[in-house]
């Protein structure tokens, strides 16, 4: 696809199967991780092997773009749509996983490669969200967005260090009742808001709230909703 479109603008969306279940990878790569010392938290050699093969696949694309001489005019974005699924994997030090309102479900990898525009090794702690991709791509293509999109141009957000922009998640549904022998759901209806270092979660079933300071408590172990009513009220 890339070779046949290298002389004209193109958009490629490639969704790898890895690292979804069923967990499987070449035996030689699995053995490589089986022979490594056991880690403290992440101890699944098959999962590790799948990640390596995913990395190999991304590397092939990067090399092909470089060999065709279009590297400096091509933006590569590596992104995950959600956190790892429990109990298949452990998202430590984050709490929760895919479908949950916690950081283990929503804090995901995002890497952008754009030679000549983004210096290698650049890092930022400014939060962005998936709905930002649409306005970002439109602006990069020198187009105009229609209506009033929820997202913002990622490059402008990072450039201006808009740390105070609130981010919202709304999940009014029940997700997959396969936990505990089919007796429980992976996720129940919730909404959440990220405001600076703070995150507020509202659970629709019992109308309870959870408030966490992610800067001080990334693992979301201390619910501050009852201890910091002022911040809870401002976030609401």
Model-found features: residue ranges?
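Non-transmembrane alpha-helical segments in soluble domains
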Residues: 2-3, 55-62, 66, 134-138, ...
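C-terminal cap/loop subdomain of S1 sulfatases and analogous C-terminal strand-loop tails that border
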Residues: 84-103, 118-122, 126, 131-214
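Soluble non-cytosolic domains of exported or imported proteins
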Residues: 41, 45-48, 52-55, 124-128, ...
């Amino acid at each position: 696809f890339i070779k046949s479109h290298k002389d004209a603008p193109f958009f490629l969306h490639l969704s790898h199967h890895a690292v979804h279940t069923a967990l499987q990878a070449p035996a030689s790569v699995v053995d490589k991780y089986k022979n490594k010392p056991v880690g403290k938290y992440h101890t699944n050699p098959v999962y590790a092997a799948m990640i390596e093969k995913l990395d190999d696949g991304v590397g092939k694309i990067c090399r092909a773009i470089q060999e065709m001489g279009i590297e400096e005019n091509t933006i590569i974005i590596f992104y995950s749509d959600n956190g790892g699924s429990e109990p298949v994997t452990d998202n430590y030090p984050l709490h929760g996983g895919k479908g949950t309102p916690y950081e283990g479900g929503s804090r995901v990898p995002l890497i952008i490669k754009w030679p000549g525009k983004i210096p290698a090794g650049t890092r930022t702690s400014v939060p962005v969200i998936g709905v930002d991709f649409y306005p970002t791509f439109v602006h990069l293509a020198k187009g105009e967005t229609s209506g009033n999109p929820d997202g913002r141009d990622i490059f402008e957000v990072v450039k201006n260090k808009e740390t105070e922009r609130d981010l919202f998640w709304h999940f009014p549904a029940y997700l997959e009742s396969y936990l505990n022998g089919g007796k429980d759901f992976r996720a129940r209806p919730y909404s959440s808001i990220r405001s600076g270092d703070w995150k507020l979660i509202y659970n629709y079933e019992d109308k309870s709230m959870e408030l966490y300071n992610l800067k001080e408590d990334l693992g979301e172990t201390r619910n501050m909703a009852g201890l910091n009513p002022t911040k809870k009220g401002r976030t609401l």
